Design a protein with these regions (language model features):
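Short alpha-helical segments that sit at the start of domains
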Residues: 4-38
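Short acidic, hydrophobic short linear motifs in intrinsically disordered regions
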Residues: 42-56
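Non-catalytic interaction surface on structured domains
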Residues: 27-30, 36, 52, 58, ...
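Residue-level marker of regulatory loop/turn positions in helix-turn-helix DNA-binding domains and
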Residues: 24-25, 43, 61
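Short amphipathic alpha-helical interaction segments
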Residues: 59-74
Length: 95
């Protein structure tokens, strides 16, 4: 991959994030959303255990992981899954 191709990919990613409304989120929040998108099932549900092991968020410290998870819940991106186990969540906003 050459330098120009890499720069074009970065520009395309920025444009896609802008189009989806996530470009203004801090980096860790965006990374966790990528992790959520990677682990959700057909009903848009996921467990925090699945997410914690995901490549996008596995580098987060324990405290950062829980802080960002709580922030995404409070901002309405994800929520606790109704009628499911305590560590089950659901993606609320659609992409």
């Amino acid at each position: 991959m050459n330098r120009k191709m890499l720069l074009n990919l970065k520009l395309a990613l920025r444009q896609a994030e802008t189009d989806l409304g996530i470009s203004n989120l801090p980096e860790f929040e965006r990374e966790m959303l990528y992790g959520v998108l990677d682990v959700i099932d057909d009903e848009k549900a996921f467990s925090s255990d699945q997410l914690r092991k995901n490549t996008y968020v596995s580098r987060f410290t324990h405290a950062t992981y829980h802080r960002i998870l709580a922030k995404l819940v409070s901002d309405g991106w994800i929520g606790k899954a109704q009628g499911r186990v305590r560590n089950e969540y659901k993606l609320l906003k659609t992409f």
